[in-house]
Amino acid sequence: MNKAENAMLIDVQVKNCFSFEEQINFSMKADMRNKKFGSNVHKESNFNILKVAGIYGPNNSGKTCFVKCIRCIKSIILNEKSDLQSNLFSKNQICELGVTFLNGGRKFKYDFKFNVKSEDYIYEKFVEITKDQYGNESEDDWLVKDNVNNIYHCKEQDIASALSIVASNNLLIHLVDVNKFKTLSEIKRILISFASNIDIINMNNIPIQKTIDLMKNKNELQSKVVDFIKNADLYLDDFKYVNIDKIVINKKK
């Protein structure tokens, strides 16, 4: 698999997952009518996306559950174990998750539905979204696998005719040899590239000494933490450990 390309989250849709029974939508689309904080907008391929966003709310309003949903999306795409659960107070066993993202300068949307009782992925859809010079968006369906309504589509007819008989206990990209199908191979590459760019940091228990020890030693983890902090603060140019005797303080007269 190729090295992960630059990716940016645009939208997340969640329905009947954890504390969310009704559908919720989280968007990183930038409202260009608002001229404030222009440095917080990333512009690429006619798309405008926020670099940083904050989620605020009282306790038990769903903030942690939303992060859990993103973690589940990442785990499922990377073929890792996930703790996805349907809403406790709903009789509906179908969890619905969707994500729109920018990867390598191109915009994609991936949706899937998971039956927590039968442990089947009953629906998958992958589309590429393009925008013309006038701002009009259009969708190009690469893959549709709808086991409930018996709707199957793929840009490659060789795989489209077999979608109805493929197992559903995992995502399609993990069930077939994608190397035999150009479209599925590209879908898998794009999805894994995107999911590999997702980092979830638990800030609840990080001792200051652990942070200092980490910053003393140059390695891949240190570089990752520094990049994360710099990206989270729009006005921070660098973040590093310096011995006390190397710190220069300019005193105003």
Regions found by a protein language model. Name each.
Residues N2-C72:
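Pre-Walker A-like glycine/lysine-rich segment at the N-terminus of P-loop NTPase domains
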Residues V14, V99-G105, F126-K131:
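Short acidic, glycine-rich loop/turn motifs
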